[in-house]
Amino acid sequence: MRPKDPFIGREILGGEYLILEKIGTGGMGSVYKASQPAMKRMVAIKILHPKLANRKDLTSRFRREARAMSQLTHPNTVKVFVYGELEEDGSLYIVMEMLEGKNLNQAVRKDGPIPTERAIPILIQVCGALQEAHELGIVHRDLKPENIFLSKQGGIADFPKVLDFGLAKVTERQMQPGSIILTQEGMVFGTPEFMSPEQAQGKTLDARSDIYSLAVILYEVLTGKLPFSAKSPMEYIQKHVTEPIIPLSERVPERRFPKELDEVLARALSKKPEQRYQTAAEFDEALRPFG
């Protein structure tokens, strides 16, 4: 029999929140559904695994995620209400809005590739969230379908929310096209299937790396496949750096896509950042004719 989770049924922050159940878990921490009686609402609380509390690299990553997300106000970014350390045991936490629905990966796995007229409006909204983040000097660095959550809001059936800024890099200045955010040279962070060529090579990153990752997401959402055929994470990393993408219509010959959409994706997936759309707003504008 599994031991009971010590957080379930617990009141935290002076009784402000009552933790009801665990709704997700990952390498960094667990996410719980909790009630906030004073506000008459449900919230999601992400708590860093206690066993990781002594890992300075991971605690700093968790704090970085909280700081990055707390700066963002765009409706398509998950909203953070408060973050800090629990008084009782020092556990790091983030209190966020509670979302109902499924992530983009689950949607594609359940329903298959998403039609262009449905997929493009989703990605356009994500571009809006990224544009705000980039203007504040925040690069996500781990965009993937699992980090785009589809909820219902304001009568919109597919209302995406960008999640998990755990790998975000925050600078003190506003991001301009081509400006640099320093990472540890030679270190590779992110998810191999969705990382940009410069990220795969451990180079310095800016907003254009996120644009590449978002274009990979769009490609997979439309086709159910990635832009390259590969058998391992290392092979994906290599192909992002060296191999041209397979055009949409070649990847799924049974479906037809506008030639112009292939051209938009080819530009967004250029190996060289300077040849891509330079901002999320530019990518947004290029996608609009197809949505």
Question: Which role fits each region the language model picked out?
Answer:
Residues 20-26, 31:
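Protein kinase glycine-rich loop
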Residues 49-71:
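AlphaC helix of the eukaryotic protein kinase fold
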Residues 56, 151-197:
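Activation segment of protein kinases
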Residues 82-85:
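A short, aromatic-enriched beta-strand patch in the conserved N-lobe beta-sheet
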Residues 88-103, 107:
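Conserved short submotifs of the Hanks-type protein kinase catalytic core
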Residues 122-123:
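Activation segment signature within eukaryotic-like protein kinase domains
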Residues 127-138:
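Protein kinase catalytic-loop region centered on the HRD/HxD motif
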Residues 130-131, 191-291:
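C-terminal lobe helix-coil module of Hanks-type protein kinase domains
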